[in-house]
């Protein structure tokens, strides 16, 4: 039996030495090639962990405060209910005003129709009454009597004509930039007519 051929306790440091050299070479090569990337990656990872842990603790704390404070929940619900009632009262008041205006408009319309009917029965024109009834405000039309409404209508004010007296679109006179052209013969290209 020869002790030199078998691995024994004396050969073990040699294997460990080779292993340490292998690890040192591999790690040294990785750090030499990617050292800065590894360093910045570790720094970014550290800050991400800090940020996420702070967010999780904040979120957990906020959920516990809302659940554990029933008095605050009751106060919020009462405030919401009071706001809803206030808004409903405002809406009801607006609806009441709208109904009153509609009733007034219906009364005014009914009164105008009665006046028109009375005028037609007397043989007077209904168009004058309609124009007078529409132009007059409810306070003045209620105080007007049949004698004042039978007066002649107001004369129209003098208006300046839009175009000169020599305007004729068929001749092209009149200062416009385009002259009249006759339309195409034949059916129109689609549409109604």
From Swiss-Prot:
> What's the main place this protein lives?
endoplasmic reticulum
Disordered: annotated span: 114-193
The protein's UniProt keywords, in alphabetical order, are: Cytoplasm, Endoplasmic reticulum, Membrane, Selenocysteine, Transmembrane, Transmembrane helix
Which superkingdom?
Eukaryota
Where is this chain compositionally biased, Basic and acidic residues type?
Answer: 114-125
In terms of InterPro entries, this protein maps to: Selenoprotein_S
Q: What subcellular locations does the record give?
A: Endoplasmic reticulum membrane; Cytoplasm
Q: Where is the composition biased (Low complexity)?
A: 137-153
The residue ranges crossing the membrane are 29-49
The Gene Ontology CC terms held by the record are:
Derlin-1 retrotranslocation complex; Derlin-1-VIMP complex
Q: How does it sit in the membrane?
A: Single-pass membrane protein
According to its UniProt entry, one GO biological process term is: endoplasmic reticulum unfolded protein response
Keyword check for Endoplasmic reticulum: yes
What does the function comment of this entry state? Involved in the degradation process of misfolded endoplasmic reticulum (ER) luminal proteins. Participates in the transfer of misfolded proteins from the ER to the cytosol, where they are destroyed by the proteasome in a ubiquitin-dependent manner.
Record family assignment: Belongs to the selenoprotein S family.
Which PANTHER family does UniProt cross-reference here?
Answer: SELENOPROTEIN S (PTHR28621:SF1)
Query: Protein name, please?
Result: Selenoprotein S A
- Give the organism the record lists: Xenopus laevis
